[in-house]
Amino acid sequence: METEISGMDNPAMTLDEVSMERNKSFVKALQELKNLRPQLYSAADYCEKSYLHSEQKQMVLDNLKDYTVKALVNAVDHLGTVASKLTDLFDHQNSDISTMEMRASCVSQQLLTCRTYIDKEGLRQQQLLAVIPLHHKHYILPNSVNKRVHFSPLRRTDTRQNHYQAISRLQPSDAPASKSLSWHLGSETKSTLKGTSTVAPSSKDSKAFSKTSGVFHLLGDDENIANKKPLAGSQVSGVPAASTAHKDLEVPKLLTAHRSLDNNPRREIIQAPVRTKSVLSAFFVKQKTPKLKAGYVS
């Protein structure tokens, strides 16, 4: 027992060596209990023979009683030793199992803590990210106005409508707004639709249309010359010249709109008049006048 205790208290021994020592002590106690059985059988045979052949039978009985008591005490002692060794081994096994379970629970708790921290950190980083507006660079407001506009990527409404509303709300009354290409295209389509709904009664309105359509995007000397040449030709030649002048004006309009947005966004752009006449109305008026003259001649 003393060697066993000293071996278990040695700190240089590993966990496997300690468990092996415990197993060896239990096996040794069990072996001693197993060897007690033949000793009791041999003692019983000796007592029986001495009682039959000896003349002092009373003394043999007294010795037999003493030996029986000692053998019983020894057997009980061995049983207690085996039971204590077994209980000790079972307790140490449970302790090892509980230690491993505790380590596993600690590792799982650390993993859960790390996962929770990662989720919170990722959510915080996503919330701190800047919201990028879902618009093209030609449709973004100037820097002075864009600072006060809050774009929401979750709300997917019409881009052109949001652009008009932002300009009408945020542009001050004294400073003119830098209008984008979408605004000019929208105003041009509205003017052409209004022009087709009304029919001109005379050829003077067609000349006024050719003059007013040339006012759109007057930004430089080169563009003024390019706009005036088709107008002069339209006044001389009539209807074909007016249609070709309108076609020639469409390309400079788009080019001037791009140049005004890229090169000088602060330059003021002249708005096209709302009341205009279409090319079709001028064409119909030009063809009605010869018919009327022919009727008068006849």
Curated annotation (Swiss-Prot):
Tissues expressing this chain: Expressed in seedlings, roots, hypocotyls, cotyledons, leaves, stems, and flowers.
Keyword Iron-sulfur included in the entry's annotation: no
Compartment(s) where it occurs, according to its Swiss-Prot or TrEMBL record: Cytoplasm, Cytoskeleton
GO CC annotations, alphabetized: cytoplasm; cytoskeleton
Keyword terms, alphabetized: Cytoplasm, Cytoskeleton
Functional summary from the UniProt entry: Involved in regulation of actin and microtubule organization. Part of a WAVE complex that activates the Arp2/3 complex.
PANTHER family per UniProt: ABELSON INTERACTING PROTEIN, ISOFORM D, ABL INTERACTOR FAMILY MEMBER
Protein family according to the UniProt entry: Belongs to the ABI family.
Subunit and partners: Binds SCAR2.
Name used for this protein in its record: Protein ABIL1
Organism: Arabidopsis thaliana (Mouse-ear cress)
Gene encoding the protein: ABIL1
